[in-house]
Amino acid sequence: MAQETNQTPGPMLCSTGCGFYGNPRTNGMCSVCYKEHLQRQQNSGRMSPMGTASGSNSPTSDSASVQRADTSLNNCEGAAGSTSEKSRNVPVAALPVTQQMTEMSISREDKITTPKTEVSEPVVTQPSPSVSQPSTSQSEEKAPELPKPKKNRCFMCRKKVGLTGFDCRCGNLFCGLHRYSDKHNCPYDYKAEAAAKIRKENPVVVAEKIQRI
């Protein structure tokens, strides 16, 4: 019995076609189909050769057969779980391949859509013919003339006064003798200026008219 339980048969599908793995000890059927088969035989009163042999054996043989059925059921469930995990892992393994294909297609589209950059050719500029420069004499003529320093002289006697000269309102410079208006016949009208200044400082005040009621 110990040798039989230690031997693990190769995986094989159930003979009834349910999709689970069968066991040669249960006539090539899975544990569920085998239990249904035994129930049918008990109901119909027909016992298979394996069923009669199991019935003639002691209660210990019945418990051993039940344990075998349970182990076969566990093996079938483990095999089914492994197949489901493999089927789930297949799209996960194939996922990087699809990503690579999509990336390759995107890169090809980018290469097609991106325009070719035009290579800018170096522009060669030819030196323009040298223009004849004007002579130094013309440049000197065009240069602005520096203002001559004004000599401080009296407008009447042409005496050098320097910084001691007097500016008159007529716009001329005079010495100490000719600084007065009666000495150099000043054309400036002092009377008109004084009258305008007086009118500005002393405006005419007119009382408001009385309105009759």
Swiss-Prot record:
GO terms for cellular component: cytoplasm. A zinc finger (A20-type) spans 8-42. It comes from Homo sapiens. Zn(2+) 3 binds at C168, C170, H184, C186. Zn(2+) 2 binds at C154, C157, C175, H178. Residues 39-149 are annotated as: Disordered. The modification N6-acetyllysine is found at K209. It holds the Pfam family zf-AN1. A zinc finger (AN1-type) spans 148-194. Residues 40-75 have a biased composition (Polar residues). The modification Phosphoserine is found at S48, S58. Zn(2+) 1 binds at C14, C18, C30, C33. The A20-type zinc finger directly binds polyubiquitin chains and associates with the 26S proteasome. The zinc-finger A20-type domain is essential for inhibition of NF-kappa-B activation. This is AN1-type zinc finger protein 5. Highly expressed in skeletal muscle. Expressed in fetal cochlea. Also expressed in infant brain, fetal heart, pancreatic islet, melanocyte, pineal gland, placenta, corneal stroma, and parathyroid tumor. Weakly expressed or undetectable in adult brain, heart, colon, thymus, spleen, kidney, liver, small intestine, placenta, lung and peripheral blood leukocytes. Expressed in rhabdomyosarcoma RD cells (at protein level). GO terms for molecular function: DNA binding; zinc ion binding. Involved in protein degradation via the ubiquitin-proteasome system. May act by anchoring ubiquitinated proteins to the proteasome. Plays a role in ubiquitin-mediated protein degradation during muscle atrophy. Plays a role in the regulation of NF-kappa-B activation and apoptosis. Inhibits NF-kappa-B activation triggered by overexpression of RIPK1 and TRAF6 but not of RELA. Also inhibits tumor necrosis factor (TNF), IL-1 and TLR4-induced NF-kappa-B activation in a dose-dependent manner. Overexpression sensitizes cells to TNF-induced apoptosis. Keywords: Acetylation, Cytoplasm, Metal-binding, Phosphoprotein, Ubl conjugation pathway, Zinc, Zinc-finger. It is found in: Cytoplasm. One of its GO terms (biological process) is face development.
